[in-house]
Amino acid sequence: MSPIEKSSKLENVCYDIRGPVLKEAKRLEEEGNKVLKLNIGNPAPFGFEAPDEILVDVIRNLPTAQGYCDSKGLYSARKAIMQHYQARGMRDVTVEDIYIGNGVSELIVQAMQALLNSGDEMLVPAPDYPLWTAAVSLSSGKAVHYLCDESSDWFPDLDDIRAKITPRTRGIVIINPNNPTGAVYSKELLMEIVNIAREHNLIIFADEIYDKILYDDAEHHSIAALAPDLLTITFNGLSKTYRVAGFRQGWMVLNGPKKHAKGYIEGLEMLASMRLCANVPAQHAIQTALGGYQSISEFILPGARLYEQRNRAWELINDIPGVSCVKPRGALYMFPRIDAKRFNIHDDQKMVLDFLLQEKVLLVQGTAFNWPWPDHFRIVTLPREDDLEMAINRFGRFLSGYHQ
């Protein structure tokens, strides 16, 4: 019998956050080892529970949530999203401009599949959240990575963006606040990106899932509000700010001129209809979440868990000889640099695998985020301070005797 192979469409599709190193971690757990997983931004397992009123509203609406809904989502949920963005300066957004999906991840794939033809290019940051690159590849497109500058607080390199635009470039992806670096972009920088998109007729895809997880004096600006004359698609959801990642509730919002994008919108509607609708019971969480008390503020202020965990992790990482890290101003991650020459590191996946096997702590290598050099890794700052201290101290101990 001939072997059954995966489709050739998947040859260039990678998502190493849940890749080979995670498989090895699962093997270790099956053997009875306890593995501290710092690879996924999943708030609930680290004690960040959803607000009670969100859970109560979902439960109360279960009797009326047993059937399908509109393929774009419940009207009440989409109206709440519409009002949320109108209050943030996107005054022309209507209910019909909003698509609710089974998490932002599903919508990213739909947005790329509806747009890209073979060989079309999409500008994606390096480092990025790797689903963006994977979705472009799955959609027969080519992800062209523009560099973000570590020496400039991980802001995008505007000259590199300009240099990588070609006649095949269809759009640009902006992840703000950024995963994995924690950068929060200034209004001035966003306006520069808007000007580039305007000059080259690019669609802007704005991943803003961490827009309320901000530290110190960081301020988030929605790029769509700065570019009312450009087609911008904004992605957000409940997973991070409202701590219900398992509910799989995300949305995308179309803003700007849409008449010239009629064909693209028809494609989005077709793909939305093909999967019938998003999870209906969980959609009842959206109106309550957006309209109620924003409890995330209890975790991001000085003295609160996320704030103090970020500070402690940053201090400990920078105390390790040969390791440095730009202090994140948003999101749930750090993206430290390792002196690759000092440790003779030429394969960062091997490094995190060796660390896992020795110390039973799971990290993600920097190249998994389409960073071109093997000199970074990502760590999640969701664990309590004592767990972060244990993990980072183990990493320092590991590096002290490590060479490839």
Regions found by a protein language model. Give the residues of each.
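Helix C-cap/helix->beta junction micro-motif
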Residues: 28-31, 139, 199-200, 230, ...
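A short helix-loop-beta submotif of the ANL/AMP-binding
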Residues: 138-144
